[in-house]
Amino acid sequence: MSEQSGDPKVLLEHVTKALVDTPDQVSVEAIEEDGETVYELTVAESDLGKVIGKSGRTARALRMLLSAAGVKAGKRFALEILE
């Protein structure tokens, strides 16, 4: 990966780009609020279903990855998937 391989934003971006058909439209914005970092994930409308997954399983897995990265970093991370 890159020299920032421990960065949750880079991890989330990398994993999401591997899931979607239009990786050039994936963007991740990190916002600090109330002692936690919220990552806002934006993808192409046609890829939204792939990112959410059946019954929300893929979205749940992405949130678990962020949670694990948060534990490792000693911080709280949250994920919002924007339409």
List the predicted regions and their residue ranges.
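RNA-contacting regions in translation and RNA-metabolism proteins
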Residues: M1-L48, A61-E83
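Glycine-centered tight-turn and secondary-structure capping sites
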Residues: I52-G56
